[in-house]
Amino acid sequence: PEGFQIIGQLASYLASLPAAGVTVFSVFIAVYRTKMKWSLTNILFFIGVAGWVIGGLGAVIDATISNNIVLHNTLWVPAHFHTYNAMGNVLFSIGFFYWFSIQFTENVKPEKFTKLTLAMLLIGGAGFLLAFYLGGADSIPRRYSTYPAELSAGAPLAVIGAIFATIYLIAILIFFFNISKRCLKVL
């Protein structure tokens, strides 16, 4: 019945508002007009919140009934899910472990290529996710191993996504190596 669809639609929208609103408001209040020294940890957490919010917006767009009919079985769903994880949870985790690794070492100076590694992480992650979002917006199904001729845009997007995912994973490995190196110095 249409009434239940409307109730479900409103519940989907309203359920996301408290969590997203409180989180985003808290982060901006913590940053706004403060003389915070921007460290790698702070940057990773701040961008991680942005990734989490963008993934949430993708979920809300997909939760709209008129969009869900079109988007749900497309690459849009893995796009917003991977946005939560790749640009949210992973950045939070790297930020925490980086912070943890400098708590027990005297050298708090960042590694030589930290800015480059951060740029690789962000560019690789954004490019990887953009390939998913573009595929979803183009109605490319998410469950094909080979794409039919009418969905031929899926194959080039998959290649582009794989290239950016490789850049992203290399950056994660560099961060992991540097964090591990710091932690092993403590032992």
Which residues make up each language-model segment?
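Juxtamembrane membrane-water interface segments that cap and precede transmembrane helices
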Residues: 70-75, 149-153
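Short, exposed beta-strand "edge-strand" segments with a Pro/Gly-rich flavor and a Y/T-containing core
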Residues: 36, 106-107
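Hydrophobic cores of alpha-helical transmembrane segments in multi-pass integral membrane proteins
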Residues: 9-30, 43-65, 79-105, 112-147, ...
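Alpha-helical transmembrane segments in multi-pass integral membrane proteins
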Residues: 29-38, 64-65, 69, 74
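Non-cytosolic membrane-interface motifs at loop->transmembrane helix junctions
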Residues: 2-13, 39, 71-79
